Amino acid sequence: MRRKKKTIECIEYLSVSAPLDKVDRLEDKQSKYIHEYVKNKEYMIVGTERRHGFSQNDVDRQWHQIVDKIRKKQVDGVIVANMSVITDNLIDAFIKIAQVQDAGGIIVTV
C-alpha cells in the first residue's frame, strides 16, 4: 500500500527588482515558475503575496503578516523564488528564516 504524502500549504511571495512598469509582468512570470516547481512536489499554494514594487519596509510588513499566518496555523510555510530580492543583506535573510522557523513553518526557495 502506498503512503500518501502530506500536503504542505504555502503562500507564494512574489518579489522582483525592476522598473515599476515591468513589475506585474515579471511577478506573473515568477508565479508561473513557482507553480511549475510545486506541481510535482508535496507543496500546495493557498495564497499569494505580491511586493508590487514596494519599499523594503513594506516587504518587512508583508513578511510579518505571513509569519503571523504561520503562527496561527493558517498556512504551513512560504515559497519564494529568490531570497535575495526580499532581503537587504545576509543578516536580514537569516532573521527572516528564523522568524518563519520560530513560528513553526518552512521556507522553500525555488
What is each PLM-predicted segment?
Residues M1-V110:
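Short, structured surface patches at the beginning of a domain
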